[in-house]
């Protein structure tokens, strides 16, 4: 396309790819929350504001709303957010949906009690830094940050996630990326996933639970 940089063309292609994936009737990652997220229910505050980053069809954002949180769900796919809207309605909850580039969103300072990022590994290393810095910035002091992603070992399983190793998460990457948090813990393990067609089978994952 004349006048469009290679980087911009790649971004548009990524957007088109996800728009296409989300155009199917089924929820590609299922309608239930991510297992790691659901297992942290006991850590959630009673009330407050939550941000779900690159939330797609909002299975996680809707679940957070069901726990009594005021949820903002951001994603760049309008097709995904159409399905998110329908899922929220079917569960009897309201969430705020913003169709945006998660790397360019302002992440307002000290706004959210909970910030969640689950399997959003489409960012370049530079974009990832912007996104993670924003996630930390918008978290209130004492707020909870929950993250799950695939590790490089996931390339052996071939059951989902990116094929580019630089987009997969390592312990040292998370330790550096979230060093500004007051405290955090990281766990790596293999698990069997059953979260829609998009996350099915054995997987190599890494989790972070942190507080600002």
Model regions: which residues?
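Conserved class I S-adenosyl-L-methionine
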Residues: 3-45, 47-56, 153
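Conserved SAM/SAH-binding beta-strand->alpha-helix loop
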Residues: 77-79
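Conserved SAM-binding strand-loop segment of SAM-dependent methyltransferases
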Residues: 91-103
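A short acidic, Gly/Pro-enriched loop at the edge of an enzyme's catalytic core
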Residues: 103-114
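A short, conserved alpha-helix within the catalytic core of class I
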Residues: 122-135
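Conserved beta-strand signature within the Rossmann-like core of class I S-adenosyl-L-methionine
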Residues: 142-150
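Short alpha-helix
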Residues: 166-186
């Amino acid at each position: 396309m004349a006048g469009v940089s290679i980087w911009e063309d790649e971004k548009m292609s990524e957007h088109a790819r996800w728009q296409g994936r989300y155009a199917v009737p089924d929820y590609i990652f299922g309608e239930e929350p991510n297992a790691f997220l659901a297992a942290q229910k006991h850590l959630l505050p009673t009330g407050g504001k939550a941000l779900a980053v690159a939330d797609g069809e909002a299975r996680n954002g809707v679940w957070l709303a069901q726990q009594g949180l005021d949820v903002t769900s951001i994603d760049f796919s309008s097709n995904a957010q159409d399905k998110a809207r329908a899922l929220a309605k079917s569960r009897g909850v309201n969430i705020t949906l913003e169709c945006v580039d998660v790397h360019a969103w302002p992440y307002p300072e000290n706004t959210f009690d909970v910030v969640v990022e689950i399997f959003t590994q489409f960012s370049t290393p530079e974009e990832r830094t912007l996104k993670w810095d924003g996630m930390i910035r918008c978290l209130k002091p004492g707020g909870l940050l929950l993250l799950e992603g695939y590790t490089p070992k996931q390339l052996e399983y071939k059951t989902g996630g990116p094929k580019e190793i630089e987009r997969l998460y390592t312990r040292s990457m998370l330790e550096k990326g979230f060093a500004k948090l007051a405290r955090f813990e990281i766990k790596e393990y293999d698990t069997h996933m059953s979260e829609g067609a998009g996350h099915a089978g054995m997987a190599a994952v890494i989790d972070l639970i942190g507080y600002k």
